[in-house]
Every structure is written in C-alpha cells, then in structure tokens.
Amino acid sequence: MSRLTTAFAAVLLALSVITPVFAATTGLVRGTITVDGKPAAGATVLLEGQGSLFKATTNSQGVYVFSLVPFGSYRVIARANGAHELQVIVNVISGHVSTVDVALSTQLKQIAQTTVTAHAGAEANPASVNTLTRTDIQTSPVNNSLNRLLETLPGVVQFSYNEPVINGFHGVTYNIDGAPLPLATTSNFAEIIDPKLINSLEVLTGAIPAEYGGDRMGGVVNIISNRPTDIPQGTYGSITGGFGNQAQGIGSFDVESRTGLSEFFLSANMQTTDRGLDAPTYTPINDAASNNDQFFRFITQLTPRSTLAFDYSNQFSQFQIPINTDPNNPLDPIVSAPGTLDTQLEYERFSNLNWTQVSQDGNGVFQLIPWWRSTRIDYYGDLPLDVLAVEPDFSVCPPTCDKTIHVVGLNQGSYASYIGLRGSDFRATKNHAWKVGFDVSRENATAYQEFACYYVNCAASGPVATPFFPAYTTPQGQAGSQIGIYAEDRWQETPNILWSYGLRYDASTGYVSGNQISPRIGVNLWDGGKNVAHIYYGRFYAAPLLEDVRQACVLLSAQQACSTTNPVYDLKPESDAYLEMGDVYTFNPRFTLGINIFEKSVVNVLDTTQLFNTPIFAVYNNSIGINHGAELRLQEQEPGGDQWFLTTTYSGSYAACISGSEFLFPPNTNQPGVSCVAQLSLEDHSQTVDSTAAYTHRFGGGPQLWYATLQGNYGSGFPVQFEDANINLNGTLPAHTTLDFSLGRNLTPGKSGEDQGLGLSLQVLNLLNHQYVIKVANGFNTTQIANGRNFLLRLTAPF
C-alpha cells in the first residue's frame, strides 16, 4: 500500500448529522483528533472557508467543537506536535451537526500535505435543500436581483414581476441572520433585501423541519448577510459605481471593521432605472424606478461561550406603473389615457438582536432573538386619468368581448408594524439531538382604499362624473398575533439511517383566527456508497398577514361601491399537506445529482389576482389546490475552479372555487352542483417546465480573481386563462429561451493593501434580446412583457 493511500485511510470520518440546530443559518462541527490511535490533547484544529477562519484546541480527550458555523463548504485542518497535518473538506449544513474524527500519524512526515473530502452519508442534504455561496452569487449574471437568484434553484419558478413561485403556489418564508422577516403578498415590488447585502443563502423547497411555520410555506429562504471574516484588525471597504442602458445607475459604499473580538459591517446602496416593472408594451411607458437602502450589522464575542449580533436595515423604493395607450395593441386590451402616471412608494425597516449562549461542552446552544419590522406602502393613482382607461367587460367575455367598460381608479395606503421574539434550546448527544423553540409575534396594521369611477354613483352607464366619482373609502385597523411552538429530534439509528421528526403548533389571531398541529417526519437512507434516498411528509399552517386582507366584495363586475354595513374580512389561513421522495447521487465529492418528486394538497389556498389594471396583488382563498412534479439539480465544482449546474423543474399546480375574500371576481367561480375537484384548473403561475443552466470559468493566475459566466433560461409558458375568468382564452403562451452573461474581477475583503486594481462586473441579461410575453390580460392578470437586452457595468475601488 502506498504512503498516500495509507494517509487517506488514516482519516476516520463519521460525519453524523444529528439535528436541526440553534440558528436558522448555522450548523455545528465536532470531532476527535487522535495521534497514532491515542487522543491528542492540545491539538490545533482550524475550520476555514467562506472567507471565515475558526480556531479550536482539543481537550484532554482530543475532542473539539465549533458551535456556530454558517452553512457552506469548509476545510477542517488538524495539527499536532510531531504528527503530519491532515485536511478534511466538509459541507456544513444549516440546522445540522457534523462530526469529523481525524486520525493523525507520526509516520507520514515525508508527505507534504494530505487533503480528503468527507462523504456526508445519511447526513447529506435532501435534493430539496440547496445553497448559493458567496462565490455563486458573485459570479452569477443575475446577482442584482434576489428573486432571480432564487429562480436558478430547483422547485422555483419565475413568475410575473420576478416573483418566485415555489412548489406551485405563492409564498416564501424569509429568515435573515437567524431572525424571521415576514413578507406580505399584496403590495411590495421591491425585494425584501438588496441582494448586494447577501453573503450566501439556503433554500428549502421541501424537507422543512418543525422550527419553520406559521407563514406561507411554499419554501424557506435562509439568508446570511455578513459572516465573521478572516481579516486583520482594522477598517476596510470599497466604493462601487456603475451604469447601463435603460438609464441604469448604481452606487454602493461598503465598509467592514475588526477591533478585538468585534466586527461591524455597513453598506449603503442606490440604484435607478427607466425599466422597473414588467410592462404591457415592448417599449415601456412610465416605468422608472429607484431604490435606496442602508444596512448595518454588528457582531461581538461577549464571553468565550456567548455572542451578540445586531442587524438594522432601512429601504426606500419608488416605482412608476407602466401603461398601454395603444387601442390596437394585440396583447393588451386595457387602454389608458396618454399621460396617466400612477406611482407606488415603499418604506421598509427591520432590526433584530441575536444573543447566543453555548454550553460548556459545545454541544448545547441557547438562543434568543427579539426582532422588529415596519412596512409602509402608498399607491398614488392618477384618478382623473385612471377612470378614462377602458378594458373588455370580462364578466360577459365570452360570448362577446367587444363590450368595454371604464376601469376603476385606485388610491391606497397601508402600514404594518411587527414585533416578535424567537427562542430555542438545542442539545446534541451521541445518536440523538433535540431542539425545542418558539416564535411569537404581534402585528398592527392600518390601511385605506379609495376607488374612483367614471360614472356617477359608480353605475355602469349614465351621467359622467367630473373628474371622477369617489366610490369607496374604507379605513382599516386591526391587530393580530401569531405563536408557534415546536419540538424536534434527529435520531441516527444506524450509520445508514437518519430519522428526522418533529411536531409544531401554530395559532393566529386577526381578522380570522385559526390554529393547527403540524407533524413533520423524514428519513435519509444511505446505501453505503453513492446514493442517499430521502422520504419526507409534513403539514404546514399559513396565516395571512393583516395587510393582505381586504374587505370581501365583488366590485369590478357591478361597478358599485362595497357595502359599508358589517364589512366582511374573511381571508382564511391556509393548510398544506406535503410529501416528497428523492435521491442524491454523488459521482465524486465535487459532482452530485439530486432528483426529487413531490406532491402537495392545499385547503384555502392563499392565491392572488391583480387589482384592477394595476400590478398590485389582491389575495383571496381558493377552496382547494394541488401541486405535483419533479425537480432536478446537477452540479459540479471542477478541480481547476470552474463550476457548472443544470436545474430543471417539471410541475403542475391546480386550484378551484373561492372560499375567502371574494374580491374583484367577474364570474361566479363556484359553479352550483359541480364539485371543486371537478373544477380544478391550471394556476395562472403554473409553468410546466422551468430550467436554468450555467457555466462559470475562473482565470487570472493563482488567485483566479477573474470569472466569466454564461447562463441559459427556459420556460414552457404560462396559461392564459384561469378560474373561468375568460374562457375565450385557452392554452399557454409560447415557450421562451434567454441567455445571460457576466464577466468580472473579484476583490478580497481585508486585502486592500495587497490587491492592487479595480473590481469589475459586467452583466448582460437577455443577451439575444428575446422579448417574450409573460402574461396577457384575462381578468386575473395584466399583460406583462419581458425586458429586452440590458447591461450593467460596475467598477469597485478598495480602500
């Protein structure tokens, strides 16, 4: 046996993932270091990767523990006096514990260095859990959009206005740096966080543990803003400026500082464009947008076993609402008066404080996270001109679509504030690890809505109001609460079998109250070789956020004001049952294939329709919904630094009947005498095939700071008719393929004194300028056309 083979055999790996862990974005790494078979007391263990460096010293039994490790790929480096150094590559998974035992030897001194890669075995991530590292994000052509980044992953479909649809239905649960970040459906065009602030992210489209719940659960997105970094003491930063076509302009200021055991990160960004939202015309009319945001993060080591972190974010965004003024536009039957200018202003703030206490042996963690968020949305309609717009009367279309009506103008505003507390306690033993925790929050929301009609009293005909008739104004004010309590465990029955199980209780109050007990159970089965099979079943409960609730009324078809006597607010909580089965095949440690088959059934689907001729969503309940499909991800990290991936999702989502918030529905969708099952029809956001593939080439000498990425995107097209809103339309829109490209040079944080030169990023989206139709107006949606070729060039100077 060769010495190199002996060195590989000397590394004893028992990577045993034991439980969902303390924070939503971290895992635990532990193990034992031995020298010639004996525990190595005082050995040095380094954990290096993702720009971070952690250091530990083994105890008298040779045991080491890294208790708070953000997800990603790392090297465990073991060193002991007189022994040969060994390195083990390990993938740290959010919510898991990885045990890496390393056996050193004094007989291998002639070998300069040995590096091996650990096979995760039964602890491997299911195919429905995927991550994007800082490198993935930096090299992506779509890294200027969080939603577009998510849409490169399996199970995620790109819908209108870049909304990510996961597992067939609306709704994504976000966590940032371990704290929840609730997001309503109805109003926001801006993304929940500027992607320039993101270090890495993890997406769970399935295998969702019991610690997550209470909100819409199409998927869970865990975001790390800034990691503890391996930089020298001092202050470092960069300034970025950029420009592009479509009047794009961008500027960023980033600074990070390390003093003693503390670090802080500060980022300020601004961006403008003349092409903000998907427009109903190929050349947008009134489509300017801008965004300004600031983000601050502070991390400090209070004691050797406790840490404190603080986040604060402020964001302001403005959007013009694009219109169509051409009555002969074959794609958009909604025709606005020239000069109509509606706008929306969005104000977002959030903060959280994260206190973590690690047990003396490192295998237990207690965490407490108070958090706060506020959101204000103001939609300013150009009411005198809004009421001059006309559209087909979808309530009688068919048999005829020739009859036109004047649309209803809209002014609305909403404000919501949240305050909450998240707590958890985790403990790992040899074969078990358990976690118990809670999430409690309180929301206060206020809102107003003003409608404007063309005719007096909002009649279908008669005297014309000048400049418009104010149809309805309804102030809303409501408080609500959510509480979630859970307990979960992961049991390593054998090296080949890993059980995950938990129970969660959710209760919510507001306009409508509800509660549910949700079991979750899954098992990983490792064949001892390259396959890890996975089966999972879970129940989910999703309470609607208060700003998503509107008074139930049918306004569009009657063009009459809603009743002011006993207004009904009846948007109901959603209840899901989800089943998945999948397999991860490891060709080699850097090359994997994941396949997942899933089925979801839903009661009281929290679904959306667009409000009048605006891009704003109104939320309602479909009585039932189903989704089924399969997802695939093939990815490889080549030894030379190049990497590539292929993601494909094949799915179909269906819904029927209306059970809550009957708002703006022209037809009677609940057909008498016909079961809802018999009425199931494709959701408007159901795209049968959605696929993305990309290849990244790294170059530029030793550090390989340069990269070039080519990405292809394919979609089979969305349905043009849903819920019988317009059965004159049928089928799906044509399939579409686009190409994106990026070229750039990265800068290394904290290396400004060494890294001479500028950072560069060139992104060209829709390289072939293929402007395809995303949606057509059908009573549920407005017409939206994809953006054409656009480029953005950014230069970054370090200091």
Predicted regions and their residues:
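Membrane-embedded beta-barrel scaffold of Gram-negative outer-membrane proteins
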Residues: 365-383, 526, 570-621, 625-628, ...
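A beta-strand signature from Gram-negative outer-membrane beta-barrel systems
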Residues: 152-153, 193-238
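Transmembrane beta-barrel wall of Gram-negative outer-membrane proteins
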Residues: 243-272, 282-322, 343-363, 428-431, ...
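Short, acidic, small-residue-rich periplasmic hinge/interaction motif at the N-terminus
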Residues: 34-38, 44-50, 79-83, 93-139, ...
